[in-house]
Amino acid sequence: DNMGAIFRNAAAFGADAVIMDRTCCDPLYRKAIRVSVGAALKVPFARGDSAGAVVDALEAQRFQVLALSPAGKQAIEDIERAPRSALLLGAEGPGLPEALLSRLPSVRIPMRVDFDSLNVATAAAIALHRLWRP
């Protein structure tokens, strides 16, 4: 469900691609395609060996890579948007590994103090909307 929703969000907010590591589920799985309302067939995607390798490749191409986490150091609305940005999402539950959070600028979506997290696809939609430029 999350993979399909992430592709749907990527299409809605004009993401150029979705890049995954080997731990991500198949976006061409029937349920992911259905949840994405076909966006998984339209938004280009690629796979890297690991999240670290994906980040290395993006940084080599001069992307601003932002790690989205409830524990992010900066509110997403305070981020200076770069011409080329990539948003790194973690798995539902464990989130992003500490090694990546300490390496990258981390951003959070501010929420009420008595609530600490959102579904990964919902968080992706909010963050993509914030970073999207028409």
Features from the language model and the residues they span:
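Glycine-rich nucleotide phosphate-binding loop and flanking beta-alpha elements
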Residues: 1, 26, 72-74, 94-96, ...
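Active-site/ligand-binding-proximal alpha/beta "capping" segment
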Residues: 66-115
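A sequence-level detector of short, solvent-exposed, charge-rich linear segments
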Residues: 43, 47-48, 52, 56, ...
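Structured adenosyl-cofactor binding patch, chiefly the S-adenosyl-L-methionine
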Residues: 9-13, 26-40, 98-134
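RNA substrate-binding interface of SAM-dependent RNA methyltransferases
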Residues: 1-71
